[in-house]
Amino acid sequence: MTATVENLTFQKDTLGNAVDKNTSRLELRSYSLAGRHGSTEPLVLAWSSQFRRLTWGCALDALHRSPCVAASQHGVTHLIRSSRTPHSTRCRKEDAQPGHHGNGAASVTAQARGQRSVLQVPLPVPRSCLFSESFVVSVSSQSRFLASVPGTGVQRSTAADMAASTAAGKQRIPKVAKVKNKAPAEVQITAEQLLREAKERELELLPPPPQQKITDEEELNDYKLRKRKTFEDNIRKNRTVISNWIKYAQWEESLKEIQRARSIYERALDVDYRNITLWLKYAEMEMKNRQVNHARNIWDRAITTLPRVNQFWYKYTYMEEMLGNVAGARQVFERWMEWQPEEQAWHSYINFELRYKEVDRARTIYERFVLVHPDVKNWIKYARFEEKHAYFAHARKVYERAVEFFGDEHMDEHLYVAFAKFEENQKEFERVRVIYKYALDRISKQDAQELFKNYTIFEKKFGDRRGIEDIIVSKRRFQYEEEVKANPHNYDAWFDYLRLVESDAEAEAVREVYERAIANVPPIQEKRHWKRYIYLWINYALYEELEAKDPERTRQVYQASLELIPHKKFTFAKMWILYAQFEIRQKNLSLARRALGTSIGKCPKNKLFKVYIELELQLREFDRCRKLYEKFLEFGPENCTSWIKFAELETILGDIDRARAIYELAISQPRLDMPEVLWKSYIDFEIEQEETERTRNLYRRLLQRTQHVKVWISFAQFELSSGKEGSLTKCRQIYEEANKTMRNCEEKEERLMLLESWRSFEEEFGTASDKERVDKLMPEKVKKRRKVQTDDGSDAGWEEYFDYIFPEDAANQPNLKLLAMAKLWKKQQQEKEDAEHHPDEDVDESES
């Protein structure tokens, strides 16, 4: 009985090179061990990533105790039990020797006796753990088990032993080990690593087929037949893949089979006649093989079928020109131009004519070109073409036609810049200025940047100072135009624009800008929106009066502005006053009075009354002044200034009683804006009239209304300044009365102010006893703390402040007495401490 293990086929590389060493997974595959007589036994193969080796074993009865294979460094070791060492194993002639590897396969025949020993055969390991290559293990045995072999010491075994051992082997099939550590490996495999290793080994690259040498015509025909069959099969699989057709035709062309290649191209055109590459390859084949007429026919068919493909036209005209057929090329160009192609096609036609010195034909083409593509750049190219060939008059006409063609609606600065540069080259500087100014007057500023730049450069080169200033003014004018167009209610921009125009332009141009500016009336009738706008009218009127010297137009401007202002909601006293002053300068006093009277009637304002009264005072019309003051006080009885001015007017006129009556009316008003000023003016008036009793009565009446410290001081100083007998006594009495009155006053600073004024009086006019008396009334300054609270009532800390404690108030407050006693006790304690320190000092002195 012999057991043979043979035909083990694997890939060349070892499995360990393709499997991640960190993978903890265990994959098992079971294969059948096929015997030569049809018997099968399971062959178990297992890949262990832990050892990076393939382990496999046979489930035969003789191997069930050690079914697995031990790991070796180079591959897998096949264990077969034997009674002797591996050196006692004999291999059959057709089998490979142990440890031998031959072209990716190993065939081993192992014969062993019944006694246990190990036969180790290193086998190559497949690259993939799933074994892309199959293998067969054949066992030759009549009794389906190992038999004894003479000279080997292997004992025979019976079939029953084999069956028992087989059953035991089937029960002991290795199980998949459970993975206990499921944590990820420290080093992870990446796709980059897999791709790099695959590229290094180049497993997917197949070796090139061997070169075939053709030695006779029969082999050549056979080769052609096979290639044509291959091409036809490819075409039959997918007819729409044009590359297959082109390869087929090029292969036929390489064999000089032009007719066949032409037939293939025609078949391909039937499939997809819109394919540009197909037409190009077809025509190129004909041209390479010098089939000119065929090429012409193909190009004709191509441009007829696909007239918008410029590449066909370019190659067709180029072929005709290379063949020297200039007329034919021109005819092709003409056919092309009928389709009105893109600009480059026209330029190609023009350059073609210029290569043959056909300037007139090129000019004709340009005439057609600028009509088909009417762009500014094309007109400029046409003009430069004429200039290049020294047709300057024609070039000027082209520019003029272009300016007329585009008109004012589609003006482009590049056209005028090119036109001006052309005239500059011709030394026509006046023409250049006219062109620039014409363009600047009609093109918006944002579209004329290049125009301004070139105009400035031109003036710097050929102009004078005035010309440069004109450019700057023009540039600023366009800037302001853009600003006011963007925002018509931007009155600051209008002011700047008008200032610029007034300094340079004529009167009509200035008036036009003013009319445009004042036409932008504020949309909201609120005075804050009209404040800047009304100055446009004022500047307009002043310009007409001072610059244009047109009084009648100035009057019209004033009247128009006054009619525009909504006087029921608000008015502008400045406008009325300026109008009245203008009429006075024109010696129209009646119109001035009428204007001021109208303003007072429509919207009485203090400023209007004051100006009108001042005017009448200058004219010495006092009756009119009285009437105006009366009217003024009817509209504003709370205005103390008006009352004072009215009384002063009567005082100047010598009507004292009338002035006193005006003051009495004034102080009797229930509401006044500045009553203290009015009372002071009334008192000063009585003092000037030397009415002491009236003045004293006024002070008493004023003190009934207010107990302000300044009133008391002023009253005392009045009594002192009267100069009569007993004035000092009356003054002192007033101070004493004021002091008594202000004891209950919360404002201690005012009371202190009164005492300081009283002390100054006593120092100047009083005796020593009077001074001492006032000094005793002076308060003591004390620093205190108080809690500070915010607006929401929360505490904000403490603050220090100075308070004044008056002796008169301290006598009535027991807590102040307690504070005084505490200060006295503290003083006594300090004196006592000082006395205790003096004896020590005496002892020190005696010792020294």
From Swiss-Prot:
GO terms for cellular component: catalytic step 2 spliceosome; nuclear speck; nucleoplasm; nucleus; post-mRNA release spliceosomal complex; Prp19 complex; spliceosomal complex; U2-type catalytic step 2 spliceosome. The keyword Protease does not apply. Residues 828-840 have a biased composition (Basic and acidic residues). Residues 81-106, 827-848 are annotated as: Disordered. Widely expressed. Highly expressed in testis. Not detected in brain and lung. It is found in: Nucleus; Nucleus speckle. The modification Phosphoserine is found at residue 503. The keyword Cell membrane does not apply. SMART domains: HAT (SM00386). InterPro entries: HAT, HAT_Syf1_CNRKL1_C, Syf1-like, TPR-like_helical_dom_sf. Signal peptide: none annotated. Identified in the spliceosome C complex. Present in a spliceosome complex assembled in vitro containing CRNKL1, HPRP8BP and SNRPB2. Component of the minor spliceosome, which splices U12-type introns. Isoform 2 seems to be predominant in the spliceosome complex. Interacts with PPIL2 (via the PPIase cyclophilin-type domain); they may form a trimeric complex with HSP90. Involved in pre-mRNA splicing process. As a component of the minor spliceosome, involved in the splicing of U12-type introns in pre-mRNAs. This is Crooked neck-like protein 1. The lineage of its organism: Eukaryota, Metazoa, Chordata, Craniata, Vertebrata. The gene is CRNKL1.
